[in-house]
Amino acid sequence: YKRMKEGDKNALVDTTANFQKLIDINARHDEVRDVINGRVQDKKVIIELQDVFYVQYLSLDSLRSGKVQYYNRHIMDYNQAHNYNPAITLCNKDLVYPADFAESYVEELTGRIMQTGDADAYLIRGSIYLNQKEYAKAIEDLSAILEKEPDNLLALFNLANARMLMFDYIESVDDKIPRIVGEQQQMQRKIDYSQVIEGYNECLRIDSDFVFALFNMANVYAKNGEIEKAIETFNQVLRLDKDIAEAYFNRGLLYIYTGQKALANADLSKAGELGIVSAYNVIKRYCKEN
């Protein structure tokens, strides 16, 4: 086990195999790792779950050009209250900022924080740190907001995301550390996602319709091997918003895992219709009846 101290709890780093049919559950071969962190993999092809959503800084130019993945009431309220300066968005792909932008903007935000302890500056700086994969700094900034505003939904959401992504990053680094020749294979390790789930539940306490907290929670369940919980949570996502392409895609992968090819085909087809073109390749490869 590799231990990592985060707050007053320890997180245990995990590499859990998830997907039957395509792989041998819990198999951990040195030549080909079958599944790591929610990825469906055979000997040649890796299919990853669509990633979690998190709050990211969005430039006004990007906003004007329509580079917004999904609209959300909390995001719109924040942007309108701040006259879109700054503006934020919910996205499950890392936005790419111009060269040197992040560093210079972080310096500006740091100055504001030192002068006033501005919660908005903490939120934007923490979100940029999260985008730049500086997870510990992101956690520190978002926690600072919650000390004063415990019901700040956007800070709660990104704090849960930062913890989850940090746990997964540490797992990926640990998994790549070469073993000494002759060393026995390491025991299966499991991440403690309890703080992450708790954070998403806090978001849902504030707004039970906050679909992105449900989506991210479903992804955590899938990574943790709780497949039925993950499917049911994706069901909740799609009951709230039937146009979340990523939920259809991820639920479709889980249906493949459970051997329900017809349901997988339907979900992946819908994901393709909604813009995830790679879903069609998954259908061709895994949804054909034998």
Feature-to-residue mapping (PLM):
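Canonical tetratricopeptide repeat
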Residues: 124, 158, 216, 250, ...
